[in-house]
């Protein structure tokens, strides 16, 4: 039991995992695969996604823990059962005794991929998905894929990936953001998420009593749309964007 005056607010990756679950449900999807880094952080994010996804009727039908780049092609082939398809083609070729031009076919029951990796890992994963006949599978990612560097070559490699992100980094015309970035240019990059959290913490302080007394209250902040859980933790819902031809395009917000 937390002390009555203890409130928690942070940029939790678990919030983003639940945001992906919420968005995919809103888009009418039911069967997911996941790709997360090896290690404790990846395990935590996967657990948060899995719990929310399965609690709301979704199915998680495959998981790969990303580590070494050289293993990536094999991991994606395993996830989509491509080697089984190649084996069937070879078996048929052996049976009929003639060469058969057969393109490997992937499993069709994965409706989307939940992705929580670094920009560098995402740069390798998306082209590998394309190469492994899975380029048409939607990819829903946490903000960790977005470096906010403006590097169009990096963004091109991730073409088609959808990701949740703070309003601070997506609303580039926000007056307060621009005022802050004039003084501290790093606020335009990935560190901007921390500036957004700082602004929101300042604005939240006088409204904590209201959020506690009225649990359905939401506040539009610069780190996300904010509400309070029964355990007095501030939870974020976030807007969405997509990498399109080297640009970041804002997507319509998820219905609440």
Model-assigned labels for residue ranges:
Residues 3-6, 80-92, 108-110, 126-199, ...:
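Extracellular/periplasmic periplasmic-binding protein-like sensory domains
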Residues 3-120:
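Extracellular/periplasmic Venus flytrap/periplasmic-binding protein
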Residues 23, 48, 124, 128, ...:
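Amphipathic alpha-helical segments that form well-ordered structural scaffolds
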Residues 36, 117, 141-144, 165, ...:
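Active-site proximal loops enriched in glycine and acidic residues that flank catalytic Cys/His/Asp
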């Amino acid at each position: 039991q937390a002390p009555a005056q203890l409130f928690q607010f942070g940029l939790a990756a678990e919030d983003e995992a639940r945001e992906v679950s919420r968005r995919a449900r809103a888009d009418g999807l039911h069967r997911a695969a996941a790709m997360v880094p090896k290690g404790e952080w990846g395990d935590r994010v996967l657990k948060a996604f899995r719990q929310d996804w399965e609690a709301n009727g979704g199915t998680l039908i495959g998981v790969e823990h990303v580590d070494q780049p050289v293993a990536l092609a094999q991991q994606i082939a395993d996830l989509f059962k491509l080697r089984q398809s190649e084996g069937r083609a070879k078996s048929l070729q052996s049976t009929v005794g003639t060469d058969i031009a057969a393109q490997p076919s992937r499993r069709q029951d994965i409706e989307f991929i939940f992705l929580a990796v670094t920009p560098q890992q995402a740069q390798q994963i998306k082209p590998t998905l394309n190469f492994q006949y899975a380029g048409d599978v939607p990819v829903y990612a946490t903000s960790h894929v977005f470096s906010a560097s403006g590097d169009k070559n990096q963004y091109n490699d991730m073409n088609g990936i959808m990701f949740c992100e703070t309003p601070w980094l997506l609303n580039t015309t926000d007056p307060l953001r621009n005022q802050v970035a004039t003084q501290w240019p790093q606020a335009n990059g990935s560190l901007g998420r921390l500036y957004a959290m700082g602004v929101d913490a300042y604005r939240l302080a006088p409204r904590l009593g209201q959020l506690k007394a009225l649990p359905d209250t939401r506040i539009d902040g610069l780190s996300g749309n904010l509400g309070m859980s029964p355990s007095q933790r501030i939870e974020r819902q976030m807007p969405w964007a997509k990498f399109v031809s080297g640009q970041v395009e804002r997507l319509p917000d998820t219905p609440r």
